[in-house]
């Protein structure tokens, strides 16, 4: 309630969250049900660069966590003009919401870089309208692991990769472009299967094929993007290879 004035565009959602919380408390903290508030959380309808959202749900976090946690996350939408133009004119994907962390509770102090509605505790499956990808965490993770791997292997890195490892902002924007093209590829082309029919992303080997297909699609697309003057395209190819 105290934070609501800061998130006026979320008022309906946050008011519903309070109701869901009060029901959960009244039921002795049994099985949580945040369906009513989840359906009102629509960051896909407010893709404005720099816009912050407050997310408070009982959820499973990613990376195989079997516990249902009560988490709070404040996100900031990453939607600069160049992303908006590419999404509108070439890679239409109304569910794509690139975000970065403003603050988070302990359950998100992990390597998880996604915020997906299917992880929220609900009495029934909600219709999905959005998927949040934390480009800042993707970039930081890439820089940390690639830097450590190159040092361990004594790998001479391309100059442009060294730029990425030294520049969080550059790498973050690179991942936004990669994610935009990759995510669009999930619903287009020759699918080995529909990945969103299987919420557990299983069997793992089959889902890995789908991820690889989308990454190779993104790699191929960057050739045309670079020819059309998209500066970040060359960095996406490096990110795909070294990731």
Where are these regions (language model features)?
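Active-site recognition of the HExxH zinc-binding catalytic motif
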Residues: 175-191
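Post-HEXXH active-site segment of zinc metalloproteases
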Residues: 190-212
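Conserved helix-loop functional segments at active or binding sites
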Residues: 186, 190-194, 220-227
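Contiguous, non-catalytic segments that form substrate-binding/exosite surfaces or channel walls
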Residues: 9-162
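Noncatalytic N-terminal accessory/assembly modules of large enzymes
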Residues: 1-3
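An active-site-proximal "capping" alpha-helix that borders the catalytic cofactor pocket
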Residues: 207-223
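Long, well-structured alpha-helical subdomains associated
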Residues: 172, 219, 223-243
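Short pre-active-site segment immediately N-terminal to the catalytic Zn-binding motif
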Residues: 161-178
